[in-house]
Amino acid sequence: MTNKTREALKAEFIENRGYWSSFWEDVLELDETFFSAYSKFSSIPSKNNALSPKIREFIYIAIDASTTHLYLPGLKLHMENALALGATRNEIMEVLELTSVLGIHTCTLGVPILMEELRDLGRGDEIDNIEFGEYEKGLKNTFIKNRGYWSPFWDDMLKLSPEFFECYLDFSSVPWISGTLEPKVKEFIYIAIDTATTHLHKEGARIHIRNALKLG
C-alpha cells in the first residue's frame, strides 16, 4: 500500500475509535491488510453508538485492569482517553472498584465444588441444615439492597462463612453506595469483565446481563 493509503486507514481509525497510538502505527506498518480488517471489526460498537464514548472507555479500562488480564499499556491509554472525554477521577476509580470484585470468582468456582463433594460423601447436611439467624438474614437483605440481586450460590457462601461474606459484602458494596455511575453502567462493567476472553465466566455473565436488562 502507498503512504497515502496508510494515512487514510489511520484517519479512518482515529475517526471511528477516537484515538491513535504508536502500537497501531507498528501494526499498520507491518500488515496494512490485517490492520484494515481489525479497524473495521473493532469500530462496529463505535458506529452503532449504543454506548457513549466515555462509557466505552470505561469498559476498556475494566477489561485491561481485570485480574485475568492486567494489560498496563491499554489501561494507561484508555484512562487517558476517558479523561479526555470528561471522565472524573472518581468515575475511573469507581470502574476499578467494580472490576476488583473479580477475585470473588475463586469462591464462585470453588464453593459449588466443595458443596458437591460434601454431598457426594454424605456430608451435605453439615451445610444444608444450617438455618439463617437474624445476623445472616440481615446480611442477605443488605446484599440485595446494595447489589440489587441474589443468587443461590450466595446462600452456600453465607452458610460456610458469614464473616467472610460480610467482608465481601462491605467491599463489593462501596461503588454501589458511594459511586456515581448509574446502576446499568455498573452492570455493563461486570458483563465486560465476565465475558472478557481471558475469563469467560458464563454464570456471572448471565446474572449481570439479566440485571442490566432489568435496569433498562
Where on the chain are the PLM-derived regions?
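Amphipathic alpha-helical interaction segments
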Residues: N49, S66-L70, G86-R89, L102-T106, ...
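Acidic, glycine/proline-rich low-complexity segments that act as flexible tails and inter-domain linkers
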Residues: M1-I55, A84, C107-V185, K214
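Amphipathic alpha-helical hairpins
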Residues: N48-I59, G74-I92, T180-F188, G204-L215
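Short acidic alpha-helix initiation/capping motifs at coil-to-helix transition points
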Residues: T33-S39, T68-L75, E163-L169, H199-A205
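Amphipathic, charged-and-aliphatic alpha-helical interface segments
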Residues: R56-Y71, K186-H201
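Generic structural signal for hydrophobic core residues of well-folded globular domains
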Residues: P45, A62-S66, T99-G103, L118, ...
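Hydrophobic, ordered structural segments
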Residues: M93-M115
